């Protein structure tokens, strides 16, 4: 049996430290063959850098996926092309730099992973995630024994729809972006594993990894606030 761990959005230094401490231990204790992590919030909660990506990979992560914060860190667009274990969303415009998938290999078994961005309530230019996923699955079929699809999206309806759309054609469809895990993990009728959102790796007593008080204040008075990462909570 092949075992794969998918790690939800790594949020800032607290999330990185937890992932880098837990992943090696989980690989040993659970006998994991593959570890995939979403790293798009690794740099202070917004984006990633080459140095941070290398650190996460060196901790035992096999592939890093990204989402709508992919370009938040200045200069990252000049580094991503050299990192073939990091993939940006596949449905970004074709001119964007970087890899649109990663293929991992262990024990004679290959797993392909790619991400698509949702388009509902997402403020980023992206092509149709359904058609893009169709094209990616056709392209990767024959190159890998299993295909894991991440949908980085806001709307649960869009995530569920993609799960049903790909049921029986891929190994798993896993949602990210909201930082809140959903209680709907299941295997769809044709055999595809599905979960709307796997949650985050970051501070527990927070609002999506941020300090609570400024977020509440912003909701109540509508005034601009600085949403800082929370560093004083245990992580999940």
What residue spans do the PLM features occupy?
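Core catalytic region of metal-dependent phosphoesterases/phosphodiesterases
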Residues: 7, 19-98
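Binuclear metal-dependent hydrolase catalytic cores centered on His/Asp/Glu-rich metal-binding motifs
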Residues: 25-26, 99-146
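Acidic/histidine-rich helix-loop elements
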Residues: 11-17, 41-48, 120-128
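Extreme N-terminal starter segment of soluble prokaryotic enzymes
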Residues: 1-4
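Short acidic, glycine-rich surface-loop motifs adjacent to enzyme active sites
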Residues: 10, 34-42, 115-119, 137-157
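Conserved beta-sheet core of the metallophosphoesterase superfamily
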Residues: 34-36, 55-66, 76-88, 156-227
């Amino acid at each position: 049996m092949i075992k794969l761990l998918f790690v939800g959005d790594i949020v800032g230094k607290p999330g990185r430290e937890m992932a880098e401490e837990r992943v090696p231990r989980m690989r040993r204790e659970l006998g994991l063959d593959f570890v995939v992590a979403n790293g798009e919030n690794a740099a202070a909660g917004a984006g990633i850098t080459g140095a941070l990506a290398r650190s996460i990979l060196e901790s035992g992560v096999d592939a890093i996926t990204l989402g709508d914060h992919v370009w938040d860190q200045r200069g990252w667009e000049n580094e991503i092309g050299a990192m073939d274990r990091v993939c940006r969303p596949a449905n970004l415009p074709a001119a964007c730099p970087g890899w649109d998938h990663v293929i991992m290999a262990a024990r004679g078994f290959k797993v392909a992973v790619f991400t698509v961005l949702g388009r509902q309530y997402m403020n980023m230019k992206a092509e149709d995630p359904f058609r893009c996923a169709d094209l990616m699955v056709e392209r990767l079929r024959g190159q890998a024994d299993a295909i894991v699809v991440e949908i980085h999206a806001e709307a649960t309806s869009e995530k569920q729809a993609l799960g049903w759309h790909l049921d029986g054609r891929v190994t798993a469809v896993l949602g990210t972006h909201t930082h809140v895990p959903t209680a709907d993990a299941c295997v769809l009728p044709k055999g595809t594993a599905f979960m709307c959102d796997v949650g985050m790796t970051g501070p527990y007593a927070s609002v999506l990894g941020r300090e609570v008080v400024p977020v509440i204040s912003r909701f109540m008075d509508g005034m601009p606030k600085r949403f800082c990462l929370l560093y004083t909570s245990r992580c999940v």
